[in-house]
UniProtKB/Swiss-Prot annotation:
Domain remark in the UniProt entry: The Asp-Asp-Xaa-Xaa-Asp/Glu (DDXXD/E) motif is important for the catalytic activity, presumably through binding to Mg(2+).
Record-linked Gene3D superfamilies: Farnesyl Diphosphate Synthase (1.10.600.10)
Protein name, per record: Microbial Terpene synthase-like protein 1
Matches recorded under Pfam families: Terpene_syn_C_2
Residues that coordinate or bind Mg(2+) 3: N243, S247
EC numbers for this chain: 4.2.3.-
Family named by the database record: Belongs to the terpene synthase family.
Key words, A-Z: Lyase, Magnesium, Metal-binding
Length: 349
């Protein structure tokens, strides 16, 4: 089904409903108690500075109501205050950088240069990165990222380079995603998930679980175990697809069809609400699969290895945190968003 066909079918339905979850399978997310009003204000000020926003402006209010730092506070509920602030800045940067690299007002050459500069900064090569970026505003943002990474490196053990390498892949995939959008390529679901599981930015966030908690799983080869790989794959797909479910309306309004909803509609030649229901069902199936895999890890004896259950539970917390934050944040819903208590609702296209 071509994009124009999907557009006409979706337009005819005009609205869609996200159903409530039929079963509560994941652990309820708990907010890091150290992420207080002071930490939240620090993240908001950093975001304003990164985007050069006037406090109180519409964009600044939107960023505050998006509560980007809150995702870090839910996803890493047990880390110290010294860690949670740079982690929250990094996660906020992930969202802001995604917006910047999607900005049609930035020239393609500037876009390529800043993407390359970001990769170099993750490798600790800021001086070289600075030579690439001619746009002074983009250069200022690259420098701010470099400062966050220096702060983060004081707390994040990354001997294997897993965090750095996974972020390089994310930035590479952002460029591929941009190319697909420009050419209006409609991939099949497997190809889309190959892209989405990387552009979602989940891999570096899972790497931080190992590094921040200093579990040493990567160095001990534990992450190569098939059951751990399966847990990571399920968690990554769940986070990416739940995000697609929540962000669909915003992405569709921007003309971004690289979302699981239109991809499913294209594959199954179905309408909007049917595609939404399919996606919601896929998310729940992933939760069931995660719980089953977690039980396998326990019964196999793998859980007795030091740090394994800290990591597995950390992935589960990330899944639940992303789902919770998606309903709380105004990022996908707009200023003045009031989260529905049942985490379900009907939305107008």
């Amino acid at each position: 089904m071509a994009i124009l066909s999907i557009v006409s079918i979706f337009a005819a339905e005009k609205s869609y409903s996200i159903p409530p979850a039929s079963n509560k399978l994941l652990a309820s997310p708990a907010l890091n108690p150290l992420y207080d009003a002071k930490a939240d204000a620090e993240i908001n000020v950093w975001c304003d500075e990164f985007l050069k926003l006037q406090p109180g402006s519409e964009k600044s209010v939107f960023i505050r109501e998006s509560r980007l730092g809150l995702l870090a506070a839910y996803a890493y509920p047990s880390i110290s205050y010294e860690k949670i602030v740079p982690v929250a800045k990094f996660i906020a940067w992930l969202f802001l950088a995604d917006d910047i690299l999607d900005n049609p007002e930035i020239s393609s050459s500037d876009m390529r240069n800043v993407a390359t500069a970001y990769k170099m900064v993750f490798k600790g090569r800021f001086d070289e990165a600075a030579l690439l970026v001619k746009n002074q505003e983009l250069l200022r943002q690259v420098k701010m990222l470099s400062e966050v990474l220096k702060e983060l490196s004081l707390h994040l053990v990354d001997k294997s380079g897993r965090f750095m390498n996974s972020m390089t892949k994310v930035l590479d995939m952002f460029e591929i995603e941009s190319n697909w959008l420009h050419k209006q390529i409609v991939p099949n679901l497997d190809t889309y998930m190959w892209l989405r599981e990387i552009t979602s930015g989940v891999a570096p966030c899972f790497a931080m679980l190992d590094g921040l908690l200093q579990l040493g799983l990567e160095e001990r080869g534990v992450l190569d175990h098939p059951l751990i790989r399966k847990v990571e794959e399920i968690g990554t797909h769940h986070i990416a697809l739940h995000n697609d479910l929540i962000s669909f309306r915003k992405e569709w309004a921007k003309g971004n069809y690289l979302n699981a909803v239109p991809i499913l509609a294209s594959i199954h030649k179905c309408g909007l609400n049917e595609a939404i229901a399919m996606l919601a069902s896929m998310v729940e199936d992933l939760e069931k699969e995660f719980i089953g895999t977690k039980q396998e890890i326990i019964s196999s004896g793998l859980a007795r290895k030091q740090g394994v259950m800290d990591y597995v539970n950390g992935v589960e917390v990330w899944m639940a945190a992303n789902a919770e934050w998606g309903w709380l944040s105004a990022r996908y819903h707009g200023i003045g968003w009031i989260p529905p208590p049942e985490k379900s609702g009907t939305f107008q296209l």
